[in-house]
Amino acid sequence: MDARDIIRRPIITEASMAQTERKRYVFEVDTRATKPEIKKAIEEIFDVQVSGLNTANVRGKKKRQGRYVGYTRKLKKATVTLSKDSKDIQIFNEG
């Protein structure tokens, strides 16, 4: 997989923005991606040094439309910790 296919989008919430001060960033990643692939993709795209990586598989929520039941899509979140001497990721610092 290409690095741009692994990293889908940044997850920008109040909780994730509070972690940026400690150089921790949260991304939605491809569900098939492994930790080494995610680390390599982050380092390649943003030109940073990753010191830690945690992942979480989030299952889809049950949603109803009348009597029909379906599920939202499942996703995988990756929390990336950068090294002390690494620069910040600019996506999270913009307005």
UniProtKB/Swiss-Prot annotation:
Keyword 4Fe-4S among record annotations? no
Q: Which InterPro entries match?
A: Nucleotide-bd_a/b_plait_sf, Ribosomal_uL23-like, Ribosomal_uL23/eL15/eS24_sf, Ribosomal_uL23_CS
Q: Which Pfam families match?
A: Ribosomal_L23
Q: What range does the record give for the signal peptide?
A: none
Keyword rRNA-binding assigned to the entry: answer is yes
Q: Which GO terms describe its molecular function?
A: rRNA binding; structural constituent of ribosome
Enumerate the Gene Ontology biological process terms. translation
Name the keywords, alphabetized.
Ribonucleoprotein, Ribosomal protein, RNA-binding, rRNA-binding
Any single Gene Ontology cellular-component annotation: ribonucleoprotein complex
Family membership noted in the UniProt record: Belongs to the universal ribosomal protein uL23 family.
Q: What does this protein do?
A: One of the early assembly proteins it binds 23S rRNA. One of the proteins that surrounds the polypeptide exit tunnel on the outside of the ribosome. Forms the main docking site for trigger factor binding to the ribosome.
Cite the record's note on assembly.
Part of the 50S ribosomal subunit. Contacts protein L29, and trigger factor when it is bound to the ribosome.
The protein here is known as Large ribosomal subunit protein uL23
Species name: Leuconostoc citreum (strain KM20)
